[in-house]
């Protein structure tokens, strides 16, 4: 067979050469030198690749699954079906697997990088297999079973008297449980991986069965095999069992290898390849045995065929029952190797022979159980519907019937620890519940994994579970939505750690509104720079999130967060701490949408109240700068007119203007105080004039004095103008219109959400600030007027404080009122010293 697909041996004739003996002895030392040089070069290359390899050892290659899964789900919005999405996700994972395999082949990262990539590959292959299982099972459950439901109701059951093939075809069409068993078997066979096991088969173009045994029988005196070694005397297939003698040792080894290769092909679902393998190695009787399981059908009995007067070939084995009984006996016998017994056990429903061989792998054991269960159900249906007398099967065969739940219970308590470990692993539990179609229990398991410790779950495990939940939700298999949301929320938290706004927004949008606000605001709290903030808001808008509520909660969380001071404590006066700077910059979140101007004012005012109470004037100024200068015009244009502004926004607007007036007054006072304390210094007088003083020095001194007098005049004018402006601005605070400074205007009713807004707490804060700031402003005003010589103005200040119109005296404590009256009394005393009465009027007799 020149086109044989199997590996060939370099042997000639009938005898196999010794393994690993192709190297001539005379070239051994030379070859060792070459090998040593090659190893040195390879180590050097590996070191270079270690240096150039990415530091995460393939992690970045695998992390592309996050955006790629997102892209696949986004494409779903363009009309892609749910099952097409699963196929696309599987294909994406395959692409990453191919890339990682390529990197391993190229030796990237050396041994350490290869080990880490291998662990990633192990996970990805299992994930791919699970996606394939999910697609196969639910495609049948959702689409095929729904389409066949009407047909099932019309039919009572399989038709009696049909051929074996017809009966089973009808059985598969009607029995969804059996069809699912077969789907799982097909999946297990498609996912079968031999792993590290190697089973080399030596072959050449013309193969003959048991050629070494034949050679020895034809050359009984051959010294190559020794004397007295008893082997079979005949070469028929039953000779070793009948004579109870072995084949030639090399043929025994080849026989075992062939049996193993055949079984592995059957385990992979490649029965036809197993037949070809038997024929290729000259063991046609094995091929005939493997044909015996096929269902019998004679198409010549069909009416539409008999009209053609042409005989068609008969399919299957008409004596299948006899073959099956013999296959059972072979599988149950101890005279054959375990692979031959297991091969017969696959087609005869003999579970014991399969468990003996496949005891160490969860998937292999599941495959063995399901093959047996399918065989029992198929055989039972055939014997119940076909009008034929069949050879009876042993009771052990029929007693092997189990449900899927019983199969998994047995796997959970398997003798082999590796089987038990996989059964209790996340992938094992996920695959088990997908097969059992117990989606509710699966989601409960996932929730327990997530709630136990999210940090122990890798982001890719969370990605995998979240997308399973999203698929189950889409096909209507999620019963408890809150449980499902916990899994998706855990994945969103993993994405928040990565900081990709589009992905975070998209998956957050699949949650309920409270969770959307909670999670996305948590993400926004971590974004500090302006451009990333804009991208985060844009992503939220595209995903359909409630941006107004999210940004409001974000700013509020940052504003109310209690953060300890650094090791240096509060910064110096006039400086802004990093904590305060973070709170102030958070107001940027409320600038993006014009509809949030009212919320911007509300949050800014709340910050200003806190900073004003803490005497952090510089923080107040910085907060004030975050509010657009034309905020009043924006609010009016937003609501159409001043009369349409809602109560909350109306109160916020007045409060904002109150702070604006306060800052203007305080800043003007600070400027006046600076000017007043920086009177131009008089130039230093020269020493007493002497005979040596010349005219030039005297002239220079006079010019300095004249310049000083001019500078003093300008200074006095500046101080006077600044004092006038300061008095006006400070009076603007005391005389603030519409019920006074930091007093809400009249509103017909409180806002609907006054309780959530802590409206009463705000009013208490404003009242407290009035009791702090109004006495302070009055003292500033008195100081400016007193130092400016306006003593009568100081006395008139008492009239404004005591006026019943504004009732400013109510914000004073006894101590503060006494302090103000004492300063006003000083002004009255100055008036008396100026020959005026205590109120500043001329004294009349």
Curated annotation (Swiss-Prot):
Transport is among the record's keywords: yes
Cell location: Nucleus, Nuclear pore complex; Nucleus envelope; Nucleus membrane; Cytoplasm, Cytoskeleton, Spindle
Gene Ontology MF terms in the entry: chromatin binding; structural constituent of nuclear pore
Biological process, per Gene Ontology: double-strand break repair via homologous recombination; eggshell formation; female gonad development; male meiosis cytokinesis; meiosis I cytokinesis; mRNA export from nucleus; positive regulation of protein localization to nucleus; post-transcriptional tethering of RNA polymerase II gene DNA at nuclear periphery
Annotated GO CC locations: chromosome; cytoplasm; nuclear envelope; nuclear matrix; nuclear membrane; nuclear periphery; nuclear pore; nuclear pore outer ring
Keywords of this entry: Chromosome, Cytoplasm, Cytoskeleton, DNA damage, DNA repair, Membrane, mRNA transport, Nuclear pore complex, Nucleus, Protein transport, Translocation, Transport
Main location: nucleus
Region (Disordered) residue spans: 1-26, 677-702
Compositional bias per record (Polar residues), positions renumbered to this chain: 7-26, 685-694
InterPro entries reported for this sequence: Nup84/Nup107
Xref: Gene3D superfamilies: 1.10.3450.20, 1.20.190.50
Gene inactivation effect: Embryonic lethal. RNAi-mediated knockdown in somatic gonadal cells results in female, but not male, infertility associated with extensive disintegration of the egg chambers and cell death in nurse cells. RNAi-mediated knockdown in spermatocytes causes abnormal localization of nuclear type-B lamin Lam, abnormal spindle envelope integrity and overall defective cytokinesis in meiosis.
Superkingdom of source: Eukaryota
Tissue expression summary: Expressed in spermatocytes (at protein level).
Assembly: Part of the nuclear pore complex (NPC).
Function: Plays a role in nuclear pore complex (NPC) assembly and maintenance. Required for nuclear import of Mad. Mediates the association between the nuclear pore complex and a subset of active chromatin regions adjacent to lamin-associated domains. Plays a role in double strand break repair by relocalizing the heterochromatic double strand breaks (DSBs) to the nuclear periphery as part of the homologous recombination (HR) repair process. Regulates cytokinesis during spermatocyte meiosis by maintaining type-B lamin Lam localization to the spindle envelope.
Family assignment from sequence similarity: Belongs to the nucleoporin Nup84/Nup107 family.
PANTHER family: NUCLEAR PORE COMPLEX PROTEIN NUP107, NUP107-RELATED
Record's protein name: Nuclear pore complex protein Nup107
């Amino acid at each position: 067979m020149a086109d044989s697909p199997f590996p060939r041996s370099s042997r000639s004739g009938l005898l196999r050469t010794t393994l690993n003996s192709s190297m001539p002895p005379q070239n051994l030392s030379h070859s060792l030198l070459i090998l040593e040089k090659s190893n040195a070069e390879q180590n050097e290359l590996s070191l270079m690749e270690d240096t150039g390899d990415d530091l995460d050892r393939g992690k970045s290659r695998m992390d592309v699954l996050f955006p790629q899964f997102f892209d696949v789900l986004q494409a779903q919005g363009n009309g892609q079906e749910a099952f097409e999405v699963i196929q696309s996700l599987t294909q994406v994972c395959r692409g990453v697997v191919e890339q990682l395999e390529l990197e391993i082949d190229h030796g990237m990262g050396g041994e350490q990088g290869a080990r880490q990539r291998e662990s990633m590959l192990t996970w990805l292959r299992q994930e791919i297999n699970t996606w394939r299982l999910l697609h196969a099972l639910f495609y049948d459950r959702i689409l095929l079973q729904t389409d066949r439901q009407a047909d099932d109701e019309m039919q009572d059951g399989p038709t009696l008297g049909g051929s074996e093939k017809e009966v089973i075809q009808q059985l598969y069409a009607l029995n969804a449980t059996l069809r699912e068993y077969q789907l799982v078997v097909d999946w297990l066979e498609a996912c079968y991986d031999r792993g590290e096991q190697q089973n080399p088969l030596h072959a050449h173009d013309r193969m003959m069965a048991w050629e070494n045994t034949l050679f020895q029988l034809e050359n009984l005196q051959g010294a190559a095999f020794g004397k007295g070694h008893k082997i079979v005397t005949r070469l028929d297939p039953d000779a070793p069992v009948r004579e109870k003698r072995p084949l030639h040792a090399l043929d025994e080894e080849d026989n075992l290898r062939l049996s193993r290769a055949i079984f592995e092909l059957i385990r992979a679902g490649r029965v036809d390849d197993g037949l070809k393998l038997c024929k290729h190695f000259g063991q046609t009787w094995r091929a005939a045995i493997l044909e015996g399981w096929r269902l019998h059908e004679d198409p010549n009995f069909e009416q539409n065929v008999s009209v053609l007067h042409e005989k068609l070939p008969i399919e299957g084995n008409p004596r299948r029952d006899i073959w099956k009984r013999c296959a059972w006996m072979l599988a149950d016998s101890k005279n054959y190797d375990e692979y031959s017994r297991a091969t017969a056990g696959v087609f005869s429903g003999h579970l014991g022979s399969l468990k003996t061989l496949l005891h160490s792998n969860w998937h292999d054991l599941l495959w063995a159980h399901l093959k047996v269960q399918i065989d029992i159900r198929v055989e039972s249906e055939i014997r119940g519907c076909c009008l034929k007398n069949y050879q009876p099967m042993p009771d052990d065969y029929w007693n092997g019937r189990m449900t899927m739940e019983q199969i998994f219970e047995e796997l959970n308590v398997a003798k082999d620890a590796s089987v038990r470990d996989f059964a209790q692993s996340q992938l094992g539990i996920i695959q088990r519940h997908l097969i059992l179609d117990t989606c509710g229990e699966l989601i409960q398991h996932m929730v327990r994994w997530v709630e136990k410790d999210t940090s122990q779950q890798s982001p890719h495990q969370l990605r995998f579970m979240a997308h399973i939940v999203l698929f189950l939700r889409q096909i209507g298999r999620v019963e408890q939505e809150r449980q499902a949301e916990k899994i998706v929320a855990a994945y969103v938290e993993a994405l928040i750690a990565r900081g990709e706004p589009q992905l975070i927004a998209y998956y957050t949008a699949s949650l309920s509104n409270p969770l959307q606000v909670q999670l996305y605001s948590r993400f926004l709290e971590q974004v500090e720079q302006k451009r990333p903030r804009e991208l985060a808001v844009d992503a939220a808008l595209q995903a359909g999130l409630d941006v107004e509520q999210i940004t409001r909660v974000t700013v509020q969380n940052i504003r109310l967060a209690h953060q300890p001071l650094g090791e240096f404590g509060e910064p110096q006066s006039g400086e802004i701490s990093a904590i305060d700077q973070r709170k102030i910059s958070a107001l940027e979140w409320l600038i993006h949408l014009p509809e949030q101007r009212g919320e911007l004012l509300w949050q800014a005012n709340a910050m200003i109240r806190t900073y004003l109470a803490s005497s952090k004037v510089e923080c107040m100024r910085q907060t004030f700068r975050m509010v657009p200068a034309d905020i009043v015009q924006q609010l009016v244009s937003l609501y159409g007119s001043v009369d349409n502004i809602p109560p909350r926004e109306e109160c916020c607007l007045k409060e904002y203007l109150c702070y604006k007036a306060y800052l203007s007054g305080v800043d003007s006072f600070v400027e006046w105080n600076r000017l007043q304390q920086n009177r131009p210094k008089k130039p230093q007088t020269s020493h007493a004039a002497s005979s040596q003083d010349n005219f030039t020095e005297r002239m220079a001194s006079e010019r300095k004095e004249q310049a000083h007098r001019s500078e003093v005049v300008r200074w006095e004018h500046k101080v006077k103008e600044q004092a006038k402006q300061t008095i006006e601005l400070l009076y603007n605070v005391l005389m603030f219109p519409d019920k006074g400074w930091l007093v809400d205007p009249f509103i017909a009713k409180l806002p609907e959400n006054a309780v959530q807004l802590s409206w009463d707490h705000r009013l208490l804060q404003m009242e407290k600030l009035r009791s702090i700031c109004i006495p302070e402003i009055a003292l500033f005003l008195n100081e400016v007027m007193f130092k400016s010589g306006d003593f009568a103005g100081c006395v008139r200040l008492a009239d404004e404080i005591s006026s019943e119109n504004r009732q400013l005296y109510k914000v004073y404590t006894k101590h503060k009122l006494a302090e103000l009256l004492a300063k006003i009394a000083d002004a009255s005393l100055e008036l008396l010293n100026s020959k005026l009465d205590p109120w500043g009027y001329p004294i009349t007799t």
